[in-house]
Protein backbone atom coordinates (compact mmCIF):
# COMPACT_ATOMS: atom_id res chain seq x y z
CA UNK A 1 0.00 0.00 0.00
CA UNK A 2 1.29 3.47 -0.82
CA UNK A 3 0.57 7.12 -0.06
CA UNK A 4 -1.24 8.68 -3.03
CA UNK A 5 -0.32 12.38 -2.91
CA UNK A 6 1.35 15.14 -0.95
CA UNK A 7 4.71 15.32 0.80
CA UNK A 8 4.85 11.53 1.33
CA UNK A 9 3.64 10.63 -2.17
CA UNK A 10 4.62 7.14 -3.38
CA UNK A 11 5.97 6.10 0.03
CA UNK A 12 5.05 2.54 0.95
CA UNK A 13 3.25 1.73 4.20
CA UNK A 14 2.67 -1.58 5.90
CA UNK A 15 -0.80 -3.15 6.02
CA UNK A 16 -2.23 -4.88 9.08
CA UNK A 17 -2.97 -8.33 7.60
CA UNK A 18 -5.70 -8.79 10.22
CA UNK A 19 -9.00 -10.48 9.38
CA UNK A 20 -10.86 -7.90 11.46
CA UNK A 21 -9.44 -4.91 9.56
CA UNK A 22 -10.40 -3.80 6.05
CA UNK A 23 -7.77 -1.55 4.55
CA UNK A 24 -9.00 1.26 2.33
CA UNK A 25 -7.38 0.43 -0.99
CA UNK A 26 -5.21 2.99 -2.80
CA UNK A 27 -7.81 3.62 -5.51
CA UNK A 28 -10.62 4.27 -3.02
CA UNK A 29 -8.41 6.36 -0.72
CA UNK A 30 -7.35 8.47 -3.70
CA UNK A 31 -10.99 8.91 -4.76
CA UNK A 32 -11.99 9.96 -1.23
CA UNK A 33 -9.27 12.59 -1.01
CA UNK A 34 -10.11 13.82 -4.52
CA UNK A 35 -13.73 14.22 -3.33
CA UNK A 36 -12.85 16.18 -0.21
CA UNK A 37 -9.67 17.86 -1.44
CA UNK A 38 -11.27 21.16 -2.48
CA UNK A 39 -12.72 21.52 1.03
CA UNK A 40 -9.75 20.14 2.92
CA UNK A 41 -8.10 22.57 5.31
CA UNK A 42 -6.95 20.27 8.06
CA UNK A 43 -5.04 21.16 11.17
CA UNK A 44 -6.00 18.08 13.14
CA UNK A 45 -7.30 14.74 11.85
CA UNK A 46 -8.81 11.89 13.86
CA UNK A 47 -8.89 8.35 12.45
CA UNK A 48 -11.10 6.59 14.98
CA UNK A 49 -10.85 3.04 13.55
CA UNK A 50 -7.34 3.47 12.18
CA UNK A 51 -6.27 0.01 11.00
CA UNK A 52 -2.86 0.65 9.38
CA UNK A 53 -3.34 4.42 9.66
CA UNK A 54 -3.37 4.90 5.88
CA UNK A 55 -6.24 7.41 5.86
CA UNK A 56 -4.75 9.65 8.57
CA UNK A 57 -1.26 9.36 7.08
CA UNK A 58 -2.71 10.42 3.72
CA UNK A 59 -4.24 13.47 5.45
CA UNK A 60 -0.85 14.27 7.01
CA UNK A 61 0.84 13.92 3.63
CA UNK A 62 -1.70 16.38 2.21
CA UNK A 63 -1.12 19.01 4.86
CA UNK A 64 -2.68 17.98 8.19
CA UNK A 65 -0.50 19.32 10.99
CA UNK A 66 -1.41 16.66 13.57
CA UNK A 67 -3.01 13.21 13.35
CA UNK A 68 -4.65 11.12 16.04
CA UNK A 69 -4.98 7.38 15.40
CA UNK A 70 -7.14 5.09 17.49
CA UNK A 71 -7.73 1.38 17.08
CA UNK A 72 -9.03 -1.20 19.52
CA UNK A 73 -6.73 -3.84 18.04
CA UNK A 74 -3.23 -3.56 19.56
CA UNK A 75 -1.59 -5.18 16.52
CA UNK A 76 -3.22 -2.65 14.19
CA UNK A 77 -2.06 0.20 16.41
CA UNK A 78 1.50 -1.14 16.34
CA UNK A 79 1.35 -1.04 12.52
CA UNK A 80 0.16 2.60 12.75
CA UNK A 81 3.09 3.47 15.01
CA UNK A 82 5.57 1.68 12.76
CA UNK A 83 4.21 3.40 9.63
CA UNK A 84 4.44 6.84 11.24
CA UNK A 85 7.95 6.17 12.52
CA UNK A 86 9.11 4.89 9.12
CA UNK A 87 7.70 8.00 7.41
CA UNK A 88 9.14 10.39 9.99
CA UNK A 89 5.75 11.60 11.25
CA UNK A 90 6.30 13.03 14.71
CA UNK A 91 3.01 14.91 15.06
CA UNK A 92 0.90 11.83 15.78
CA UNK A 93 -0.87 10.45 18.84
CA UNK A 94 -1.89 6.81 19.25
CA UNK A 95 -4.69 5.32 21.35
CA UNK A 96 -5.72 1.73 21.93
CA UNK A 97 -9.33 2.24 23.03
CA UNK A 98 -12.86 1.26 22.16
CA UNK A 99 -14.24 4.16 20.12
CA UNK A 100 -16.80 5.08 22.81
CA UNK A 101 -14.08 5.18 25.46
CA UNK A 102 -11.88 7.32 23.22
CA UNK A 103 -14.68 9.81 22.57
CA UNK A 104 -15.51 10.07 26.28
CA UNK A 105 -11.93 10.96 27.23
CA UNK A 106 -11.07 13.25 24.30
CA UNK A 107 -11.83 16.98 24.28
CA UNK A 108 -9.96 18.04 21.12
CA UNK A 109 -11.72 19.52 18.10
CA UNK A 110 -10.94 17.95 14.73
CA UNK A 111 -11.18 19.41 11.24
CA UNK A 112 -11.42 15.92 9.74
CA UNK A 113 -12.80 12.80 11.37
CA UNK A 114 -12.37 9.51 9.52
CA UNK A 115 -14.70 6.66 10.43
CA UNK A 116 -14.27 3.18 8.99
CA UNK A 117 -15.81 0.90 11.62
CA UNK A 118 -16.35 -2.83 11.15
CA UNK A 119 -19.29 -3.29 8.77
CA UNK A 120 -21.21 -5.15 11.49
CA UNK A 121 -21.42 -1.83 13.37
CA UNK A 122 -24.42 -0.63 11.41
CA UNK A 123 -25.84 1.99 13.79
CA UNK A 124 -24.48 4.91 11.80
CA UNK A 125 -26.41 7.57 13.75
CA UNK A 126 -25.03 6.27 17.04
CA UNK A 127 -21.45 6.54 15.76
CA UNK A 128 -22.14 10.04 14.37
CA UNK A 129 -23.62 11.02 17.73
CA UNK A 130 -20.54 9.80 19.57
CA UNK A 131 -18.12 11.95 17.50
CA UNK A 132 -20.38 14.96 16.92
CA UNK A 133 -18.91 17.10 19.71
CA UNK A 134 -15.35 16.41 18.53
CA UNK A 135 -15.96 18.01 15.13
CA UNK A 136 -14.73 21.58 14.67
CA UNK A 137 -17.11 24.31 13.47
CA UNK A 138 -16.14 23.88 9.81
CA UNK A 139 -15.19 20.24 10.10
CA UNK A 140 -15.86 17.25 7.91
CA UNK A 141 -16.59 13.57 8.59
CA UNK A 142 -15.63 10.86 6.09
CA UNK A 143 -17.59 7.71 6.89
CA UNK A 144 -16.82 4.39 5.19
CA UNK A 145 -19.45 1.68 5.56
CA UNK A 146 -20.94 -1.38 3.93
CA UNK A 147 -22.96 -0.69 0.80
CA UNK A 148 -26.18 -1.87 2.51
CA UNK A 149 -25.78 0.45 5.52
CA UNK A 150 -28.48 3.03 6.19
CA UNK A 151 -27.34 6.56 6.90
CA UNK A 152 -29.10 9.91 7.46
CA UNK A 153 -29.08 12.64 4.78
CA UNK A 154 -28.72 15.17 7.59
CA UNK A 155 -27.60 14.82 11.16
CA UNK A 156 -28.05 17.76 13.53
CA UNK A 157 -26.20 20.57 11.70
CA UNK A 158 -24.22 18.18 9.48
CA UNK A 159 -25.10 17.99 5.80
CA UNK A 160 -24.42 14.99 3.59
CA UNK A 161 -22.29 16.35 0.75
CA UNK A 162 -21.04 13.14 -0.92
CA UNK A 163 -22.33 9.59 -1.29
CA UNK A 164 -20.28 7.23 -3.46
CA UNK A 165 -20.00 3.46 -3.75
CA UNK A 166 -16.86 1.45 -4.48
CA UNK A 167 -17.60 -2.27 -4.80
CA UNK A 168 -18.99 -3.38 -1.43
CA UNK A 169 -18.02 -0.09 0.26
CA UNK A 170 -20.00 3.13 0.54
CA UNK A 171 -18.31 6.42 1.40
CA UNK A 172 -20.35 9.35 2.69
CA UNK A 173 -19.05 12.78 3.61
CA UNK A 174 -20.73 15.09 6.10
CA UNK A 175 -19.83 18.75 6.49
CA UNK A 176 -20.71 21.12 9.26
Pin down the residues of each PLM region.
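Class I S-adenosyl-L-methionine-dependent methyltransferase catalytic core
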Residues: 1-176
Amino acid sequence: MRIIAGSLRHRIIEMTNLETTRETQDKVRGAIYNMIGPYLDVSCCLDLFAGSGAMAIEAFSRGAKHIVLNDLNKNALEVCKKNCKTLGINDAEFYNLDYNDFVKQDSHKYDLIILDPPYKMDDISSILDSVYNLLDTKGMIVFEMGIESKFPDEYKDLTLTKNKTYGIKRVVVYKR
